[in-house]
């Protein structure tokens, strides 16, 4: 679903580590032995789609009646991440680990280079967000870069120039590599940056695994029968990003909101962004044989798959799109409520990203709902106008 701009440079790692990468392996191994790593938390061996049904079956009736199967499965991940953050808050102040001085020097140089490379990738492919990260503390800024690069590399597996060669086994290997870096065994420089990040912040592995699950879906699934199915897909490929990054961005010390509610807002932003991607890219996706719209809602609107492939804007299509855009805006509204509860230095990049993405919906409307042959975008002038307003709003958020 994401754009497949060339990111081949992210895939230049040699089949076998060499040079500085060998030293990275050695230092990580030594740190792992000396420190003891936080164990990787895995919810269960049940696949997320199976877990969805299981969660509803075992949940109290009151909860099950409020949430769909997909929402319940995602809610479990939100609770897990919130618990990790609260646990880390209680542990804070225990003291930093110590290791040999010569290792610390080597490690600092190598890791500095790894984070620098992540920053370069973020600056090239996410310019506005990169600008916003400059307001964060150096440690948070670098951690967000590392997470961004991992997400981009994962997306490139199924949406990049080599996507036709990707198999389920390749994604299994990528997931094993993820587990290794969470255990302190990075494969390359980019992995090293993320491995260091997850050792410093209370980041759960499950959202990362779930994003890979979304890539698996893209290998075989090109239709979504209902919004419940689509919601789960949106969580996998975009909602997960919010759960990955909030532990890094931090929650404001004076926030009265529950940790869970802040994570729900982050999840809503990811869902809103992906729904916006879907509505913007209807024509592009249809030319690839894909329809990321709820088929049952299409049918209720008197539309068919053939109408999508035909690509003609009709009154039925306009009415249908108005409903889809409204839903995306509701998710953006829910997400915006959580921005005020983020750490003050993290609010601006999040709010700016939210406002700019939400304006894509305005652009679809301005194009008379023609998302078949016209690509909705926010022009540079509007972006420049939005950024200072978002900054001012973030500064006074409380």
UniProtKB/Swiss-Prot annotation:
Entry's localization field: Plastid, Chloroplast membrane; Plastid, Chloroplast, Plastoglobule
Pfam families named in the record: SQS_PSY
SUPFAM superfamilies: Terpenoid synthases
UniProt transit peptide range: 1-80
Keywords: Carotenoid biosynthesis, Chloroplast, Isoprene biosynthesis, Membrane, Plastid, Transferase, Transit peptide
Signal peptide (residue range): none
Membrane topology: Peripheral membrane protein
BP GO annotations: carotenoid biosynthetic process
E.C. number(s) listed in UniProt: 2.5.1.32
Keyword hit for Transit peptide: yes
Principal place of residence: plastid
Catalytic activity as recorded in UniProt: 2 (2E,6E,10E)-geranylgeranyl diphosphate = 15-cis-phytoene + 2 diphosphate
Gene3D superfamilies with a match to the protein in the record: Farnesyl Diphosphate Synthase
Induction details: Induced by salt stress and abscisic acid (ABA) in roots.
Function: Catalyzes the conversion of geranylgeranyl diphosphate to phytoene. Mediates the first committed step in carotenoid biosynthesis.
Family, as annotated: Belongs to the phytoene/squalene synthase family.
Protein name per UniProt: Phytoene synthase 2, chloroplastic
Origin species: Oryza sativa subsp. japonica
